[in-house]
Amino acid sequence: NLLQFNKMIKEETGKNAIPFYAFYGCYCGGGGQGKPKDGTDRCCFVHDCCYGRLVNCNTKSDIYSYSLKEGYITCGKGTNCEEQICECDRVAAECFRRNLDTYNNGYMFYRDSKCTETSEEC
């Protein structure tokens, strides 16, 4: 769920999802259009695509289990939806960590109206 995803992001990056990732670029936060602005925004694009492949799953509220050991997130057992949501969130949180050095404060609270390029396919 969203609270778990926020916790995962904090554990991986040291940053809170809000404000650092909730409204970043063209894809972080609700919806998305255009081309991802940088590596961090691409993490969100891939996360959106991952969620988009999940059928009949409540990505915002399904509670999953995971553990953090020696800096690695491991998703636990649960329903098919819970396990898949956890994997989508884990991959995104790790992607955010890999892209910390290119995080651009100029893309925080970025306006959707600036995301006018043709959207990519998942």
Curated annotation (Swiss-Prot):
Record keywords: Calcium, Disulfide bond, Hydrolase, Lipid degradation, Lipid metabolism, Metal-binding, Neurotoxin, Presynaptic neurotoxin, Secreted, Toxin
Pfam families tied to this protein: Phospholip_A2_1
One record GO biological process: phospholipid metabolic process
Function: Snake venom phospholipase A2 (PLA2) that inhibits neuromuscular transmission by blocking acetylcholine release from the nerve termini. PLA2 catalyzes the calcium-dependent hydrolysis of the 2-acyl groups in 3-sn-phosphoglycerides.
Protein name in the entry: Neutral phospholipase A2 agkistrodotoxin
Co-factor(s): Ca(2+)
PROSITE patterns reported in the protein's UniProt record: PA2_ASP, PA2_HIS
Cofactor note: Binds 1 Ca(2+) ion.
